[in-house]
């Protein structure tokens, strides 16, 4: 046999072979490092209104407010019923006897006049002095705690997500998805990253949270601002009948004015009297109402008397009435 010849030149590259069957799935790779913190997600829908929390502890009593302005005077109340009549006063001391007047001239007998009209009612007296103001009443009992108020009005919705915010969220979701796929597949070479997918729909609203514990007691608040003056109050009920006043001390009135001269009596029958005795003094008569003077009457019949007793009889008739006994 001859010697071994030199090796030939390498042949040309043949055509590419057919794609072989897909190999078995490789083992999952190790977990990669934690990525950077992503932007916050889209806020979910507003959850249902939670049940009202437990009532908090009663706070300390606030400082007393400033004294308000004096309210408007109310309407005058209805006129009270007439009080009970007072006890009858003691009889006043009898006044001194007035001086005896001079006998007037004998007038003609007139007809009895009609009673005069009643005079007008006197002017009402001045009102009494207002009494001193009474002491303030005792402080009332503290009222009970009021019922829980109605829930407040729902607040306005939050700001709508912007396009930039949606893009950031979508990029974060896509990156997490590709990171999970890269961890589950074992490939010899890392391929190029695909295009970001479309943003997914927003997730369902989360369940409402549990009721929180009652918070701590707050700090005591500042005193409130002075409020406006109150409105005019309603008309109060009619007051009860007042008690009967005490009996006043007996008083003595001023001395009255001398009464008017009474009407002259009827002329007595003609008689022939002599020096008679003075009769007993009768009880004082009731003062009559002065009537309107009537027209002069007709002249009476001429009297008969002795010349010696005419002077004495004229003086006695001025102090006595009726015929002589």
UniProtKB/Swiss-Prot annotation:
This protein's record includes keyword Zinc: yes
GO biological process annotation, one example:
chondrocyte differentiation
Q: Region Disordered: start and end of each range?
A: 1-163, 187-325
**What Pfam family is a match, any one?**
Collagen
A Gene Ontology CC term for this entry?
Answer: collagen type IX trimer
For this UniProt entry, the molecular function terms from Gene Ontology, in alphabetical order, are:
carbohydrate binding; metal ion binding; protein homodimerization activity
Q: Where in the cell is it found?
A: Secreted, Extracellular space, Extracellular matrix
Compositional bias annotation for Basic and acidic residues:
237-249
UniProt keyword terms in alphabetical order: Collagen, Extracellular matrix, Hydroxylation, Metal-binding, Repeat, Secreted, Zinc
Record field: compositional bias (Pro residues): 198-208, 292-304
Q: Which InterPro entries match?
A: Collagen (IPR008160), Collagen_superfamily (IPR050149)
Is Metal-binding one of the keywords UniProt gives this record? yes
UniProt PTM comment: Covalently linked to the telopeptides of type II collagen by lysine-derived cross-links.
Under PANTHER family, the record lists:
COLLAGEN ALPHA (PTHR24023), COLLAGEN TRIPLE HELIX REPEAT (PTHR24023:SF1082)
The UniProt comment on domains reads: Each subunit is composed of three triple-helical domains interspersed with non-collagenous domains. The globular domain at the N-terminus of type IX collagen molecules represents the NC4 domain which may participate in electrostatic interactions with polyanionic glycosaminoglycans in cartilage.
Q: What does this protein do?
A: Structural component of hyaline cartilage and vitreous of the eye.
Q: How does it assemble?
A: Heterotrimer of an alpha 1(IX), an alpha 2(IX) and an alpha 3(IX) chain.
Designated name of the protein? Collagen alpha-1(IX) chain
Could you tell me which species this protein originates from? Rattus norvegicus (Rat)
Q: Which gene encodes it?
A: Col9a1
């Amino acid at each position: 046999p001859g010697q071994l010849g030199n090796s030939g030149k390498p042949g040309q590259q043949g055509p590419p072979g057919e794609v072989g069957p897909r190999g078995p799935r490789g083992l999952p790779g190790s977990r990669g490092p934690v990525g950077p913190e992503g932007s916050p997600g889209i806020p979910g829908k507003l959850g249902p209104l939670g049940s009202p929390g437990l009532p908090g502890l009663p706070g300390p009593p606030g400082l007393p407010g400033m004294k308000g302005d004096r309210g408007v005077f109310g309407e005058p109340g209805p006129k009270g019923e007439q009080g009970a009549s007072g006890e009858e006063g003691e009889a006043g001391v009898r006044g001194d006897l007035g001086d005896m007047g001079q006998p007037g001239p004998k007038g003609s007998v007139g007809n009895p006049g009609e009673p005069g009209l009643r005079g007008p009612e006197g002017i009402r007296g001045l009102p009494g002095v207002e009494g001193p103001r009474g002491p303030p009443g005792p402080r009332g009992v503290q009222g009970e705690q009021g019922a829980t108020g109605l829930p407040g009005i729902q607040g306005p919705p939050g700001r709508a997500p912007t396009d930039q915010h949606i893009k950031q969220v979508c990029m974060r979701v896509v990156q997490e998805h590709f990171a999970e796929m890269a961890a589950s597949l074992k490939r010899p070479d890392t391929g190029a990253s695909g295009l970001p997918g479309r943003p997914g729909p927003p997730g369902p609203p989360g369940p409402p949270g549990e009721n929180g514990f009652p918070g701590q007691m707050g700090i005591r608040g500042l005193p409130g601002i002075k409020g406006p003056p109150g409105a005019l109050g309603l008309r109060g009920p009619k007051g009860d009948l007042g008690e009967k006043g005490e009996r006043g001390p007996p008083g003595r009135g001023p001395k009255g004015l001398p009464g008017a001269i009474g009407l002259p009596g009827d002329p007595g029958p003609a008689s022939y009297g002599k020096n008679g005795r003075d009769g007993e003094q009768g009880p004082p008569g009731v003062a009559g109402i002065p009537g309107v003077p009537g027209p002069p009457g007709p002249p009476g019949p001429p009297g008969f008397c002795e010349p010696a007793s005419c002077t004495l009889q004229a003086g006695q008739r001025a102090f006595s009435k009726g015929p002589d006994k």
